[in-house]
């Protein structure tokens, strides 16, 4: 036992500390991905997408390329410094993308830190053939964007080499480089087919700064004329200017009426177009208005199927369409016929209007009021007035039957029945319609009737006050007053 275990044993152990110690062994640590209970080790599953869906990064492939081999298989070296030490320059490095330049510049900076006595053994292994700087051609001028990345680094970019190298490449290295180039070309073709199908014209014609990258990738396959027509439909303005829109407008109503004659109409339109290619004289404004009217008529028939049109009318409309195409002199006459037919259809479809006369008949009211007043005073006079009023009622009813509806006649009969059912004992003053009738009478007649009524009423009251049971006999007749 160690000293730590002795220290722990010497202290008094409580039951709570023992429980915590036992539980701490079973708890997983932060570094472990699974608890101690999981004895079986399982490999974690990593989801990966399909490779052709993603655009691959070609920088890794360019980094793995054999250094110093160009497309023709020749080895190129060039040097800028006047020192006798050779400088290794790959022939394809001038056309590499800028991202690859950054990778190579970082590698060179890392190599400079190792000191001047370090030997470039990796370069010897990857590119075993070098030429002297005097025999190598000068770097091409006029391409600032394609200059090597170490041109600004000065003498630190030169690498001292140990020993003499061979002047010819081996056959195995040449075959391996050819195989790699073939695989790279096949993969580029696959990428252009499956991934880069929707390449815009700007991407196909890049700027002058990216000409090196385009030269490296090689010429892309140009879209043929058939593939270009399969995309979006393109209409040039020259074709639209050559079309005659008037003839197209003429053919539209005919296509809606009958679809079978579309081929013959198109042939007729093409024949007229060939004849009048230089100058096309469009129809007048009247013909266009007539065609619009016919089109509206056909659309209204489709929207309102309840209108039943005979076969003769349909034939007439077809004949009108043919006449509009053949001759334009009868346009005004045909438009009038169309307007007349539209008006006749409106008149047929609209129902007749019904008028109800609910006015009160007032001429018979004053006569009835006079008959009620006279019936209170004497039976003979009341009978004569009732006969006169009864004779006036049928005259009014016969006059009203001519110019009134059934509802108004029923209302008038009901009003007459109610007036006939009123008891004769009620006076004109107490009756509900007495005040209205008196207000409507003339001023002269109303004053004389009031005077007579007041005199009769005063005499009747005097007789009742005297207690004469035969007071009614003292009342004079209507003729004696």
UniProtKB/Swiss-Prot annotation:
Gene Ontology terms for molecular function: dynein complex binding
A matching Pfam family: DAAP1
GO cellular component, one term: dynein axonemal particle
Biased composition (Basic residues): 177-188
Coiled-coil residue spans: none
Modified sites of kind Phosphoserine: 83, 145, 147, 328
A GO BP entry: outer dynein arm assembly
Keyword Plastid: no
Ranges for region Disordered: 70-91, 131-233, 306-397, 415-454
Cellular localization per UniProt: Dynein axonemal particle; Cytoplasm
InterPro entries: DNAAF8
Domain of life according to the entry: Eukaryota
Keyword Ribonucleoprotein: no
Function: In cyliated cells, dynein axonemal particle-specific protein required for deployment of ODA to the axoneme. Interacts with outer dynein arm (ODA) subunits.
Biased composition (Basic and acidic residues): 163-176, 310-322, 337-349, 359-380
Protein name per the record: Dynein axonemal assembly factor 8
UniProt biased composition (Polar residues): 144-155, 198-211, 323-336
Key words of the record: Cytoplasm, Phosphoprotein
């Amino acid at each position: 036992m160690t000293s730590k275990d002795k220290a722990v044993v010497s202290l008094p152990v409580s039951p709570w500390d023992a429980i915590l110690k036992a539980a701490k062994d079973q708890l997983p640590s932060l570094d472990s991905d699974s608890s101690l209970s999981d004895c079986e080790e399982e490999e974690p599953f990593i989801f990966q997408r399909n490779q052709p869906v993603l655009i691959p990064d070609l920088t890794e492939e360019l980094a793995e390329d054999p250094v110093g081999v160009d497309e023709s298989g020749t080895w190129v070296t060039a040097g800028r410094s006047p020192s006798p030490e050779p400088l290794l320059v790959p022939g394809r490095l001038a056309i590499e993308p800028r991202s690859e330049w950054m990778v190579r510049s970082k590698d060179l900076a890392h190599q400079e830190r190792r000191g001047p006595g370090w030997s470039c053994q990796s370069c010897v292994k990857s590119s075993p053939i070098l030429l002297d700087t005097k025999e190598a051609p000068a770097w091409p001028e006029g391409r600032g964007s394609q200059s090597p990345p170490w041109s600004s680094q000065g003498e630190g970019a030169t690498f001292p080499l140990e020993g003499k190298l061979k002047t010819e490449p081996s056959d195995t290295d040449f075959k391996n480089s050819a195989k790699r180039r073939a695989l790279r070309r096949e993969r580029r073709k696959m990428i252009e087919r499956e991934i880069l199908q929707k390449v815009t014209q700007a991407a196909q014609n890049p700027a002058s700064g990216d000409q090196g990258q385009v030269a490296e990738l090689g010429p892309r396959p140009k879209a043929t004329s058939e593939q270009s027509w399969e995309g979006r439909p393109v209409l040039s303005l020259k074709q639209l200017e050559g079309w005659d829109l008037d003839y197209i407008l003429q053919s539209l109503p005919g296509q809606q009426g009958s679809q079978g004659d579309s081929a013959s109409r198109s042939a007729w339109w093409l024949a007229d177009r060939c004849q009048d290619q230089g100058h096309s004289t469009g129809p007048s404004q009247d013909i266009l208005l007539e065609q619009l009217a016919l089109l509206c008529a056909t659309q209204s028939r489709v929207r309102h199927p309840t209108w039943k049109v005979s076969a003769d009318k349909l034939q007439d409309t077809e004949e009108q369409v043919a006449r509009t195409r053949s001759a334009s002199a009868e346009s005004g006459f045909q438009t009038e016929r169309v307007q007349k037919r539209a008006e006749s259809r409106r008149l047929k479809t609209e129902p007749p209007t019904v008028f109800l006369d609910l006015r009160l008949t007032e001429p018979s009211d004053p006569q009835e009021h006079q008959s009620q007043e006279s019936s209170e005073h004497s039976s003979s006079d009341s009978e004569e007035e009732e006969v006169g009023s009864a004779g006036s009622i049928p005259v009014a009813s016969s006059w009203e039957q001519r110019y009134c509806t059934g509802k108004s006649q029923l209302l008038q009969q009901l009003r007459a029945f109610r007036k006939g059912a009123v008891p004769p004992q009620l006076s004109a003053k107490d009756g509900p319609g007495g005040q209205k009738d008196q207000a409507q009478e003339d001023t002269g007649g109303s004053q004389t009737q009031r005077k007579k009524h007041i005199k009769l009423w005063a005499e009747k009251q005097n007789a009742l006050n005297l207690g004469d049971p035969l007071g009614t006999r003292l009342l004079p007749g209507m003729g004696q007053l």
